[in-house]
Every structure is written in structure tokens, then in C-alpha cells.
Swiss-Prot record:
<comment type="subunit">
    <text>Heterotrimer of UreA (gamma), UreB (beta) and UreC (alpha) subunits. Three heterotrimers associate to form the active enzyme.</text>
</comment>
<dbReference type="InterPro" id="IPR002019">
    <property type="entry name" value="Urease_beta-like"/>
</dbReference>
<dbReference type="GO" id="GO:0009039">
    <property type="term" value="F:urease activity"/>
</dbReference>
<dbReference type="GO" id="GO:0035550">
    <property type="term" value="C:urease complex"/>
</dbReference>
<keyword id="KW-0378">Hydrolase</keyword>
<comment type="similarity">
    <text>Belongs to the urease beta subunit family.</text>
</comment>
<dbReference type="InterPro" id="IPR050069">
    <property type="entry name" value="Urease_subunit"/>
</dbReference>
<protein>
    <recommendedName>
        <fullName>Urease subunit beta</fullName>
        <ecNumber>3.5.1.5</ecNumber>
    </recommendedName>
</protein>
<comment type="pathway">
    <text>Nitrogen metabolism; urea degradation; CO(2) and NH(3) from urea (urease route): step 1/1.</text>
</comment>
<dbReference type="InterPro" id="IPR036461">
    <property type="entry name" value="Urease_betasu_sf"/>
</dbReference>
<keyword id="KW-0963">Cytoplasm</keyword>
<dbReference type="GO" id="GO:0043419">
    <property type="term" value="P:urea catabolic process"/>
</dbReference>
<dbReference type="Pfam" id="PF00699">
    <property type="entry name" value="Urease_beta"/>
</dbReference>
Length: 102
């Protein structure tokens, strides 16, 4: 065994966020710079150059592994899956649009 080596099991694949509501949206970067969004960023509050239904994304984040991100190149369109925030569903910071309960 090498330090840091991963030994995957023969069991079923790990499922991210089971039993939580998800939403699939098409996102377009209408800006002239790349935009990267992290796994736990409140998606409705992302950079204004990203074009999508922000009301539908309220209270949701990317349904990707913790600590990872998705990058949107200028002019790029991509489909992403969002997932509801869990826990007490309280959001502070980001662009300051919520500052409390979702």
C-alpha cells in the first residue's frame, strides 16, 4: 500500500445526496471570462454573467462531490444538476441576497 492510495470496494457506487430533490438546468456563460462555481455555493447567487433560471435554483447548490467545482468558459453552455441545501437551510454571505433562512 502506498500512502494516499485509494482502494475502491466491490460494492455499489457511492450516491451523492440520496433522497434529496434535484433539478437539472442548462447554464450559459454570457461573459468574457471563465467562471468557476464550487460545490457548496448557493447557485442562485452565482456570477451575473451566468444565464439560467435563478428563481428555480434558489436554495440549491451543485450536486457534485464536496470540494470540487464546475468551470464555465466564456460562451459555453452546459447542463448541471443542482440539489437542495440540507440542514437548517440558512445561507449567509455569497452575494448577500439571502442572509438567513431559505
Amino acid at each position: 500500500m502506498t500512502p494516499g492510495e485509494l482502494l475502491p470496494s466491490d460494492g455499489p457506487d457511492h450516491v451523492l445526496n440520496p433522497d434529496r430533490r434535484t433539478l437539472t438546468l442548462v447554464i450559459e456563460n454570457g461573459g468574457d471570462r471563465p467562471i468557476q462555481v464550487g460545490s457548496h455555493y448557493h447557485f442562485a447567487e452565482t456570477n451575473g454573467a451566468l444565464r439560467f433560471d435563478r428563481a428555480a435554483a434558489h436554495g440549491m447548490r451543485l450536486n457534485i462531490a464536496s470540494g470540487t467545482a464546475v468551470r464555465f468558459e466564456p460562451g459555453q453552455q452546459r447542463t448541471v444538476e443542482l440539489v437542495d441545501y440540507a440542514g437548517d437551510r440558512t445561507v449567509y454571505g455569497f452575494r448577500g441576497l439571502v442572509q438567513g433562512k431559505l
